[in-house]
Amino acid sequence: MENNKTTLRVSFAAIDPYIETYIVSPTEKSQNGRGWVEWGERNGYADYLLELSKQAPTLRAVINGTVDFIVGDDITIAQLPDTSYIPGVMNTRGDTIISQVESIARDLETYGGFALQIIRNALGKIVEVYYCDVHFLRSNKDNTVFYYSENWTSGKRKIVEYPAFIHISPEKWASLSDEEKERNYNSILYVKREHTQTYPLPVYCAAVKECEIERCIADYHLNAINNGFTSSLIVNFNNGVPTDEVREEIEKDFNEKFSGHQNAGRIMFSWNDNKDAATTITEPKVEDFGDRYKALSSHVRQQIFTAFRANPNLFGIPTESLGFSQEEYESAFKLYNRTAIRPAQRLIIETYEKLYGQPGVISITPFSLQAETEKTVQ
């Protein structure tokens, strides 16, 4: 008895692609022949943190809010000696101490550290201070030499080398050789919260996965709007299977006209030899999906706030409680101010005191809830 076998060819198009997220770990690796230590795989950890801070809503809210708290209501600093800048101006470009502290505070919260570029005059006196974007910097193992590039992930990059900043008295500067002076005219002051490795770690490093989950949730909903994670329409062609070229052309025409976010879904195509061979789709259903999604969103947000030791209400993110009184807000702010804001302000103040070589050159007026209850940080 002869068995008649029919080969059924079915082609599907426009099925949504799998979105792969790549979490970069803060590994450190020295390369032979290179002076710097790589910061993450393919030198991409800083870039990864920057993108994460832009795309994870809760993380961005906490960073932005914390920066506002650190900068406070006002910042004053003594005039740089031997300069004609107006008070509060830090360089010939006109950067103010407030804008500079805002930038380094953002780096401190995003990466766990910050950097300043220090310019000296011929006598060795500091005459200019610039904010230096820490994510463009790489360093040797002990942070004595720094390398600046605006594209560390590319093979073709321009790299500028700088020495680490050291405080040198005018007397000692005069005793330096011309070569040593030339090397130290332009230097980098590199500041880290932790000193356990070459590069800093952000306070939320233990919650990076939660930040990534939150970003993926946003991507999920965007893709659901754009083209649907499950197709909203199946088109069966039951008059045989055409050539690959014909199928691709028909599928392309259909997708261009009918699919996308304006048509609330994507189209799935099925090519069949006859109607009896039409494609059958079984859609898996998840019970209580809404409750699971809500629980997941709540969990990841809480983990991010836990990493910062912060109360969500401080950043305009409501909790499940029925309310948040002024008294509770003030209490939460005072705790966060004590455990996170003032230590960051102290680190910044100590950095500028190191530059000037004396204490008391800079003060930060705290972010005011009730101004009379707060004292100036000096």
Roles of regions detected by a PLM:
Residues 2-67, 71-272, 377:
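Structured, contiguous alpha/beta core segments that scaffold functional sites
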Residues 193-351, 361-366:
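A contiguous, surface-oriented mixed alpha/beta subdomain in the mid-to-C-terminal portion of proteins
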